[in-house]
């Protein structure tokens, strides 16, 4: 009760401080008034009907300024006041003294009140006359305050009252009975408390002061009815036209929001103001007949002023930024973030009696210098409507006669009508956090918070992590509400939003410094997810709409619902909050217009506000266009078709027109995107282009095929959106009404995405055909042609792209050209859409098309002679014209031509081929060969198949550069080859048919599209396609798992029939097809496959190898080298434990034959390339076969994301799947060629294809196959290459020492030329060239081409992307280890992996040669530089003579002593020459 009784105290004290009323003068004046200083002879000029500062004319525009922090109020003089019935609330019955109060009029106390006001003004500026303009008082008063008058000349505006008498002291005079006591206190928690009796007095004061002109006599709290002045309802509602209400009772005062004459605000009488009342005017009296006591008059006066100011503050919007307040008005009392902005004027007295002031945080500037930072804000997310209504109220003062706030949404309060607990702003330096009313220290100065605040200020979408220090939460709340209504994954984003690096740092910062110090994981924070602001902001604003994100996030966090149930709850929340988020009346207008319909002035202002930039007409048009798009493509068309008359069949549009409409929609989408990119300057600035916001199709493809009108409407709507965006770009800077905000642009993008995802199946998910048919490109191509052709091509393009007219359209009875865009006459025409190329608007020709117009010939079924139509074959025709070739028209492929083949005889078209079929209607190259891309699945045969090529950007009937090659198969009349692929049967696929077997459940890789899953090949065709010796019988079932592979094989079956009754021709096994099918010969039996390695080869890399074209007899092109992207060469180098460089044997450019991977195949490892035939089918076949046998397949994926094929294999999570990056940059010699000390080092981690991944794979293999031999992936024996060496052009390396001696030494047996022997055997060559053994002594010991093993540095995930060697932070000892280490070739040695963060714990291995057999140092040639690696004991370089043949030993031990013990026996080498000059000392056969 105590909190309810002191409601008036803070407002009274705020008013006193805002008007520079000092505490001491006011106390003295109030005491003097209560003690009864009276002058009966003086008339009551203050409370007469003079329309100046009377209770009946309370000044509505009394200046109000931002208040300073309130301080404890002093107790009234005289000690505790005795309670009177008028001041008692619900304390008890009236006292006898109050009952005996006389009802006769008492002497007028006006002189005492005038003296009090005189004393107050004298205390503010004693003896200084009028206050200087521009000065600021300590209390923060307004220098331009009209109340601050000259204290030497006037006591009150318009009052001739004499100066205050000298006898009027606070302690003098005969005291009058005190009927009411004022208790002034502060609502701040720091104010001092009063005694219980004083608080009771204050309660009575607040009870009467919190009442309004139209409230009831009693409060909800049960306070007793107290006699107090009541105003006249009529007087409050209908003031006098002249501005003077006339004589009225003293308790009458205007209602909040009533109009006030200008003289009342300025403090001086205007010419139009009424004259002061005569001195004999009756003094105001109580309703019971008694006059108001002086203290009660002060209370009522100040109460009226407070209520009037509160009402005007709530009614009046904030002036625009940078403009000063009007004369007589001051800025708002508080900034918008420190005061509730709800419309409290028309609410109950509880709502208007708790303004909740916020402590001032900075020094108050004078009113004329204070910046206008407050913004008029409503508790509504529709800020445009609120701003328009506020502007209407400001521009139409006459609208104040209506009830204030009728156009504002009622704030959400407690059931008892009170503000929510904890709605008060947090104390200075703290922000909301935790439960109701709790807070924490603010962290505004932390760098993470500063960066987050800057990102929040620039963000257009909701930020994933929000803290109160980032700023006003209104923007975040509105963005969250918008996202809940617009995003498909709203709940997922609220619960698990994707965090960038900066947002992740902010989330970690909040967890460490905000959440962690305050308790366990279930403590109350006020927001259930990171993006949500504290719920206290919504409670303080009373905005029920802001609770929507909290409700959605709470459901998203719950584990008691599954995804479908949560989706239902989200849809329910959207429907429940829809009217609140997007308010509209019955006529579809915003709330602001419907709310002010009863007030003409506000209605006119609100109607005018619709033309403001906040609610422009283009935004409405954007929304209407989006609505039309959704309605045109929606599934309701199917229901309308089903409701047609029974027995009638709706006409189905032709496939040609559907394709025309699809291309038109594609071009319309592209036009909108171009306009958006020009408007915003880039795709990143266009809102809505987010993968998470891609909508689902509006209807299935089958419903779209029966809705051509919807396609046309959607295309027209998109072009309207394009025009709106262009107007915004061209006129937005000069005319704000044409601007489009982020919400409108997001809606436009969404309209384009809805059309795109719906029409995509109609154009076969390919926009190339529509781009090729853009009419503007045809004109552009014409004007860019050579000078001899520019005139003719431009004229042809202009004539063919002429706009269609009604006169050009043929009637149904006349034989003529087709209507616009090639559709039938009965189906209408797309007259409002841009023309597509080629279009025939009615041009007729009776002759054969010339070379300038090679076209198919269309014929009408009802006409006589077939009329020809002219089109242009674009790219091929231009190329042919430039060469001066003559073309012959080919056979037309169109529905009209197929319907009437009599008009397309062979005599009329000599260049056509009789066996041209629709299935082969694909482009041909210069050699006449068909392209080898697979045929696309089609659900319809016949006419629809004939247009599959035109939708992809080329004209199947266009001429080619050279005549096509003759067919190897002669088709019989009427024979037509069957289509390899077709739609999935309705009854389901046959188990022997060709189709995708996608596993159920979750997969490691993306699942294929519906179109790929719908492709089907009949079992009889499958058996005929795979029955070929090129495909091993054990692997043929894998082909049935890949319809794309079957289509590729069918495209190659162009030879004569293999046997009688065959439907297809014999398969022509070309070289490329053999290379793509070579993987089937790696492992004969699919049951033996245990590990599958997936990779993406570079250009011209394959396991068949071959001589490059630069060599005689070579046919293979040299592969391209890439430092960034790894292919087959990088894969084999990693599996073979060696370094890949461009000059090494490991690169495919140096191969002269196929690499040998039989050692890997023997372990059950299958290497599969994305370019191999049936790549997808093989993986899914192995997964199905091994999974059926309860075995798990180990899949190592080295394919990059951009190289993963569309509709690639779906690998079930039942199997083991490991993915790593494959790149040559793992070798330090490739990444940092200048770092010589790291030339033999290779980086590795679990994310790189190398020993880090292989260790995981080997461990998994050991668990899957414990009885099998361990998997050995990183061994030199796994891979062997075929390269050019001195042993032959196609030498398999490494060549074993025995085989090396057998192949090389006989060639030099008996040779007398020692120089030729030295050069042939490589006596003077470096021991190792690019890592491979090259010299004679190295080849004789380890084998020719045996490679040095690298040192692997485990760098972790971050080190794998290091740009500079310094980023690795390699210890100095480890760097020295890599420089001197020389790991000799060993086919079975495991990889040497060293952690990059530690120094090595062993000595670097080196190679030691036996003394007396040449140099003890090992020469290594790398990147054109030779390096000499010395043994450990040698300190200086040893130089030997030329021509020495040495015996070698190994030094593998940790110390020289151990090395001598483990030294091998000398290897004997045959004498290579019997020359006497050579000497016998190096002959190992001599003792």
Swiss-Prot record:
Give the GO cellular component terms, alphabetically: host cell nucleoplasm; host cell nucleus
Report the source organism.
Equine herpesvirus 1 (strain Kentucky A) (EHV-1)
Ranges of Acidic residues composition bias in the record: 214-224
| Compositionally biased spans, kind Basic and acidic residues | 988-1007
Q: Per the record, where are the segments of Pro residues compositional bias?
A: 66-75, 273-285
Origin superkingdom: Viruses
Q: What does this protein do?
A: This IE protein is a multifunctional protein capable of migrating to the nucleus, binding to DNA, trans-activating other viral genes, and autoregulating its own synthesis.
Disordered as annotated region, ranges:
41-295, 310-371, 409-442, 803-1007
Specify the protein name. Major viral transcription factor
How is it modified post-translationally?
Answer: A long stretch of serine residues may be a major site of phosphorylation.
Which family, according to the similarity comment? Answer: Belongs to the herpesviridae ICP4 family.
| Low complexity composition-biased segments | 165-193, 201-213, 235-272, 807-829, 849-860, 867-877, 938-951
């Amino acid at each position: 009760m105590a909190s309810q009784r002191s409601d008036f105290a803070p407002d009274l004290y705020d008013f006193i401080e805002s008007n520079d009323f000092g505490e001491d003068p006011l106390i003295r004046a109030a005491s003097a008034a209560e003690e009864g200083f009276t002058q009966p002879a003086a008339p009551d000029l203050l409370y007469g009907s003079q329309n100046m500062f009377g209770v009946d004319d309370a000044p509505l525009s009394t200046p109000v300024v931002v208040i300073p922090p309130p301080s404890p109020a002093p107790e009234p003089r005289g000690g505790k006041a005795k309670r009177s019935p008028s001041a008692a609330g619900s304390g008890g019955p009236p006292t006898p003294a109050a009952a005996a109060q006389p009802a006769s009029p008492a002497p007028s106390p006006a002189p005492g009140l005038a003296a009090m006001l005189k004393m107050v003004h004298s205390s503010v500026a004693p003896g200084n006359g009028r206050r200087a303009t521009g000065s600021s008082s300590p209390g923060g008063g307004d220098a331009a305050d009209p109340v601050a008058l000259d204290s030497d000349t006037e006591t009150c505006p318009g009052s001739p009252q004499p100066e205050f008498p000298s006898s009027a002291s606070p302690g003098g005079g005969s005291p009058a009975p005190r009927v009411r006591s004022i208790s002034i206190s502060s609502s701040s928690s720091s104010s001092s408390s009063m005694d219980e009796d004083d608080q009771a007095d204050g309660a009575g004061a607040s009870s009467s002061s919190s009442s309004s002109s139209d409230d009831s006599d009693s409060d909800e709290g049960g306070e007793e009815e107290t006699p107090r002045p009541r105003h006249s309802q009529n007087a409050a509602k209908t003031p006098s036209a002249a501005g003077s209400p006339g004589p009225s009772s003293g308790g009458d005062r205007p209602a909040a929001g009533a109009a006030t004459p200008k003289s009342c605000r300025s403090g001086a009488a205007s010419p139009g103001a009424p004259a002061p009342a005569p001195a004999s005017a009756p003094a105001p009296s109580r309703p019971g007949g008694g006059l108001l006591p002086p203290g009660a008059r002060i209370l009522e006066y100040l109460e009226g002023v407070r209520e009037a100011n509160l009402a005007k503050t709530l009614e009046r919007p904030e002036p625009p930024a940078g403009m000063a307040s009007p004369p007589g008005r001051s800025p708002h009392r508080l900034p918008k973030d420190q005061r509730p902005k709800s419309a409290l004027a028309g609410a109950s007295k509880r709502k208007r009696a708790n303004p909740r002031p916020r402590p001032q945080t900075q020094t108050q500037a004078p009113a004329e210098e204070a910046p206008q930072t407050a913004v008029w804000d409503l508790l509504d997310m529709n800020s445009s409507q609120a701003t328009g209504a506020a502007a209407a109220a400001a521009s139409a003062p006459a609208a104040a006669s209506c009830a204030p706030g009728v156009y504002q949404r009622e704030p959400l309060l407690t059931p008892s009508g009170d503000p929510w607990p904890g709605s008060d702003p947090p104390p200075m330096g703290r922000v909301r956090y935790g439960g109701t009313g709790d807070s924490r220290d603010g962290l505004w100065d932390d760098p993470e918070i500063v960066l987050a605040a800057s990102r929040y200020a620039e963000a257009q979408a909701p930020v994933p992590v929000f803290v109160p220090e980032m700023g006003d939460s209104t923007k975040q709340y509105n963005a969250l509400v918008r996202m809940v209504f617009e995003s498909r994954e709203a709940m997922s984003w609220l619960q698990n939003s994707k965090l960038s690096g900066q947002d992740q740092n902010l989330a970690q910062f909040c967890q460490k410094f905000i959440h962690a110090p305050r308790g366990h994981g279930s403590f109350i924070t006020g927001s259930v997810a990171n993006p949500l602001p504290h719920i206290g902001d919504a409670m303080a604003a009373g905005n029920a709409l802001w609770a929507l994100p909290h409700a959605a996030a709470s459901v998203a966090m719950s584990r008691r619902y599954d995804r479908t149930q949560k989706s239902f709850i989200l849809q329910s929340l959207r429907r429940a909050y829809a009217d609140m988020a997007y308010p509209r009346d019955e006529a579809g207008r915003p709330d602001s217009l419907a709310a002010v319909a009863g007030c003409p002035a506000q209605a006119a202002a609100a109607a005018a506000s619709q033309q403001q930039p906040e609610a422009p007409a283009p935004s409405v048009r954007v929304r209407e266009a989006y609505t039309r798009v959704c309605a045109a493509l929606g599934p309701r068309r199917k229901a309308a078709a089903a409701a047609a008359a029974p027995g009638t069949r709706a006409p189905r549009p032709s496939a040609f027109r559907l394709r025309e409409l699809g291309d038109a929609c594609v071009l319309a989408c592209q036009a909108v995107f171009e306009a958006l990119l020009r408007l915003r300057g880039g795709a990143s600035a266009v809102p809505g282009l987010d993968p998470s916001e891609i909508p689902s199709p509006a209807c299935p493809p089958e419903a779209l095929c029966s809705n051509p009108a919807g396609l046309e409407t959607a295309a027209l709507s998109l072009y309207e959106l394009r025009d709106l965006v262009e107007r915004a770009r061209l006129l937005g800077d000069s005319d704000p009404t044409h601007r489009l905000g982020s919400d409108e642009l997001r809606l436009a993008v969404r309209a384009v995405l809805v059309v795109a995802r719906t029409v995509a199946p109609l154009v076969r998910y390919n926009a190339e055909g529509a781009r090729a048919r853009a009419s503007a490109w045809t004109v552009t191509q014409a004007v860019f042609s050579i000078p001899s052709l520019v005139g003719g091509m431009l004229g042809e393009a202009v004539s063919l792209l002429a706009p269609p007219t009604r006169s050009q359209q043929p009637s149904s009875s006349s034989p003529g050209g087709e209507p616009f865009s090639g559709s039938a006459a009965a189906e209408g025409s797309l007259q409002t859409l841009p023309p597509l190329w080629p279009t025939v608007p009615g041009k007729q020709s009776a002759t054969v098309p010339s070379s300038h117009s090679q076209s198919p010939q269309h014929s009408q079924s009802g006409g006589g002679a077939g009329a020809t139509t002219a089109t242009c074959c674009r790219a091929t025709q231009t190329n042919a014209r430039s060469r001066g070739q003559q073309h012959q028209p080919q056979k037309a492929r169109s529905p009209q031509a197929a319907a009437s083949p009599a008009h397309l005889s062979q005599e009329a078209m000599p260049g056509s081929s009789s066996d041209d079929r629709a299935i082969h209607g694909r482009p041909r190259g210069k050699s006449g060969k068909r392209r080898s891309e697979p045929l696309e699945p089609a659900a319809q045969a016949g006419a629809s198949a004939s247009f599959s090529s035109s939708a992809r950007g080329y004209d199947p009937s266009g001429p080619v550069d050279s005549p096509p090659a003759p067919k190897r198969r002669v088709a019989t009349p009427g024979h037509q080859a069957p289509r390899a692929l077709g739609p999935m049967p309705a009854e389901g696929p046959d188990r022997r048919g060709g189709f995708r077997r996608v596993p159920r459940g979750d997969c490691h890789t993306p699942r294929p599209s519906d179109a790929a899953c719908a492709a089907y090949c009949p079992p009889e065709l499958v058996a005929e396609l795979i029955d070929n010796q090129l495909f091993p019988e054990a692997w043929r079932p894998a082909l049935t798992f890949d319809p794309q592979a079957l289509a590729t094989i069918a495209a190659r079956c162009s030879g004569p029939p293999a046997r009688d009754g065959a439907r297809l021709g014999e398969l022509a096994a070309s070289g490329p097809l053999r290379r793509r099918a070579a993987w089937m010969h790696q492992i004969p039996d699919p049951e033996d496959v245990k590990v599958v390695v997936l990779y993406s080869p570079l250009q011209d890399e394959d396991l068949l190898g071959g001589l490059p074209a630069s060599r005689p007899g070579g046919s293979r092109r040299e592969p391209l080298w890439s430092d960034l992207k790894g292919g087959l060469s990088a894969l084999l180098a990693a599996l073979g434990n060696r370094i890949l460089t461009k000059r090494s044997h490991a690169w495919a450019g140096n191969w002269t034959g196929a690499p040998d991977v039989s050692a890997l195949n023997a372990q059950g490892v299958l290497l599969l390339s994305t370019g191999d035939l049936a790549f997808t089918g093989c993986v899914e076949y192995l997964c199905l076969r091994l999974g059926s046998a309860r075995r798990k397949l180990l899949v190592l994926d080295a394919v990059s994301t951009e190289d993963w094929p569309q509709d690639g294999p779906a690998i079930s999570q039942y199997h083991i799947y490991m993915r790593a990056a494959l790149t040559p940059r793992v070798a330090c010699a490739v990444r940092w060629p200048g770092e010589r000390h790291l030339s033999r080092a290779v980086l590795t981690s679990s994310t790189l294809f190398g020993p880090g991944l292989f260790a995981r794979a080997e461990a998994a293999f050991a668990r899957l196959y414990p009885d099998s031999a361990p998997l050995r992936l990183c061994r030199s024996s796994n891979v062997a290459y075929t390269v050019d060496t001195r042993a032959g052009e196609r030498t398999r390396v490494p060549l074993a020492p025995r085989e090396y001696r057998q192949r090389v030494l006989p060639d030099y047996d008996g040779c007398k030329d020692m120089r030729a022997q030295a050069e042939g055997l490589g006596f003077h060559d470096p021991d190792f060239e690019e890592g491979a053994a090259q010299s004679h002594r190295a080849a004789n010991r380890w084998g020719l081409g045996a490679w040095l093993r690298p040192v692997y540095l485990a760098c972790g995930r971050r080190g794998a992307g290091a740009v500079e060697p310094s980023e690795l932070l390699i210890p100095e000892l480890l760097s020295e280890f890599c420089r001197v280490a020389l790991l000799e070739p060993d086919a079975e040695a495991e990889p040497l992996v060293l952690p990059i963060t530690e120094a090595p714990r062993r000595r670097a291995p080196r190679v030691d040669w036996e003394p007396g057999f040449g140099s003890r140092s090992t020469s290594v040639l790398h990147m054109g530089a030779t390096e000499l690696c010395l043994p450990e004991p040698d300190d200086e370089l040893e130089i030997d003579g030329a021509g020495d043949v040495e015996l070698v030993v190994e030094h593998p031990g940790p110390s020289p002593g151990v090395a001598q013990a483990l030294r091998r026996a000398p290897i004997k080498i045959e004498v290579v020459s019997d020359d006497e000059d050579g000497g016998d000392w190096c002959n190992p056969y001599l003792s």
